Amino acid sequence: MRCTVFGTGYLGATHAAGMAELGHEVLGVDIDAGKVAKLASGEIPFYEPGLRKLLNDNIAAGRLAFTTDYDAGAEFADLHFLAVGTPQKKGEYAADLRHVHAVVDRLVPRLNRPAVIVGKSTVPVGTAAELRGRVRGLAPGVNVEIAWNPEFLREGFAVQDTLHPDRIVLGVQRDSSAAEASIRELYAPLLARQVPLLVTDLQTAELVKVSANAFLATKISFINAISEVCEAVDADVTLLADALGHDPRIGRRFLNAGLGFGGGCLPKDIRAFMARAGELGANHALTFLSEVDAINMRRRSRMVELATVACGGSLLGANIAVLGAAFKPESDDVRDSPALNVAGMLQLNGATVNVYDPKAMENSRRQFPTLNYSTSVSEACERADAVLVLTEWREFVELDPAGLAGSVRAKVVVDGRNCLDADRWMRAGWRFHCLGRGAAAHSR
């Protein structure tokens, strides 16, 4: 089977390579000639474990190619995926759909035979219905169906999530005649492994993704709110989360108290969800998401407060090592990164900040050029008054506190992700600070 993928960023490149791995012929289309040239040569412009090999294997097999030519994309296949970004509008909560509209406006007039356009991008509910009207005006007389197949990729696990998904959701038009059959053929290898396929209307499929992200964000902010109470009474939020997680109705995943969530999805998606609910007159239904967002942002301020305490009450003149810049481990994504945000606030409060991340240094320099960047943990920690672990890379979790002691000026560590073994660090003579554990971390 043949398909095209319009947009070759994180989502598009992963989907294109994944569909080629399933045995299909795939053409990735993007207006960015530099990005297309990199991908065509087997390079990916971001870090994602396993994706480069997947890309190169399928280019070599002749199943995957990339182009800037929309005419070639329109001619290549009758199944077209939209995988462009939907960022937050500047100064607003709403999603910016200009990239989605641009692809549709360029592609559809070039279609001269029946086709199915399938959205992968995260969009406000009602977008697919709006695109249906747009398509009818752009290609009168040509049967072009709109469908929605939301992605559920986790950065750092995108290849796994593409080739071994938990479920496949497909939203189709009520009068659809081709979309479901096309998707069943495309995903046949996955369906043969009993991956569930849920076929819905368009608006339900659009809501599935944003609802999933809203729920995950709520779960993270819930445990972070509880961690504030734990700090007030010297309880241990990690033990509390373990106890909650044994309840099968709750589960342990996403109950990791710490610095909170960031990245290019959860923050902007819950804000866009709130904005869309307001447009639909259902704003009261999602007011709780405002508090979810507020709790999440408050964690960053709380980390600065904790660092200030760790440095004796003032950051002025303090030398602080920040370990972690990506918003999560196994990624180089620094969009709305809590770690970088905290590093910037520390600098604004008078500290000299030295940042190290195994994969996100280049992106970090572009976003925060005024910070100091180091090439290793030991360099970042040289003569540090405090070491802050803000992204839970394995390299940081497995640090040897005794070995690191020779680099720092003061043996003070602040665990922003509750990922370190507190007892191990304290036995090595370090003062240990963390979020949500109060004195409990010092008493075991």
Predicted feature descriptions by range:
Residues 1-444:
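Structural/interface elements that position substrates and couple domains in central-metabolism enzymes
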